[in-house]
Amino acid sequence: IAFQIAFNRMPHDRPPSLDPVAARRWATLALGSKPFKPSSVTSPWLHEEVARRMEQRLAFIRLQPKSWVCWNPLRAGLNILALLGKRYPQAMGHLFADRVGEVEWVQASRRASWWKPARWFQPQLKAEPLKSHSTDMVWANMLLHQAADPEALLAEWHRVLAIDGFLMFSCLGPDTLKELRAVYEQQAWPMPAHEFTDMHDWGDMLVHAGFAEPVMDMEKITLTYASPEKLLEDLRSMGRNFHVDRFGGLRGKAWLNQLHAVLLTMAKPDHEGRLALTFEVVYGHALKPQPRLKVASESQIGLDDMRQMLKQARSAP
């Protein structure tokens, strides 16, 4: 169920219990450095699936962007680039990434031979610095829950959006990994992940960042795994543990064997003996409205905002 958010609680500086130093280090880790190898880098399956579901929501949005930007495309899901190109064939796509080399790798990976049909269905893509008011849609899939400073990231998305442009984003919510958290708690281990922000608080932060008409939605997706090894491999592909009180050092093979044994207790008959993990996925959509001048004895407005207001006034009927 989707609904419009109108809350007044103060936003958080960052997701609860998140270590910003670790999150920032992970976000900017250069492509090609361990554990990233260009020949093997792919987007996590869950990220691709969430991107596919979020793309379907674009059918309910009447605005037709002339340009869009995909933020951190490897984590956002590489398949979405073709889907956005198909939905908005006349629009120019842009790529932005925090990690050095990511945009270049994505562009190289999508080059097809001239005789392959896929070549003719690739969207137009550019990789260049993003100017203020330069794009009509920001696409940010599965990013915010791992942002070291989410309010700064929201502000950056607001900056690059043109007036009446819109933001589409998704991230993980509080019920994510609840089965794994319970297992760790039973063992008196530090938590396996930081606490994820509630969708209502994301709505607050959107308004605080200057967005209008935020609409939030959520769903829970259950993934099952044949073995502890497969479960841990999938989790590693999605990110790292950024909890401030996570294990402080490396652990040996004995602990890993213990972890595997403990994870086997998560197997349930209703999942045919497979290990089940819950992922709460939060979806958000918001517009960038006309800037409003505060009524005061003296008011200030940025030059870029003034230009946009004058441009809108000239084009109004």
Where on the chain are the PLM-derived regions?
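C-terminal lobe and adjacent flexible extensions of AdoMet/dcAdoMet transferase-like proteins
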Residues: 229-317
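A short SAM/SAH-binding and catalytic strip from SAM-dependent methyltransferases
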Residues: 136-151
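Short glycine-enriched loops at secondary-structure junctions
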Residues: 99-101, 144, 171-175
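N-terminal amphipathic/basic-hydrophobic helices that include classical n-h-c signal peptides
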Residues: 1-9
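Conserved catalytic/acceptor-binding region of the Class I
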Residues: 168-230, 237-251
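A short glycine-rich, Lys/Arg-flanked "PGG" loop and its adjoining helix->strand segment in the class I
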Residues: 151-163
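Class I SAM-dependent methyltransferase SAM/SAH-binding core
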Residues: 56-59, 63-131, 152
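Class I SAM-dependent methyltransferase Rossmann-like catalytic core
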Residues: 10-64
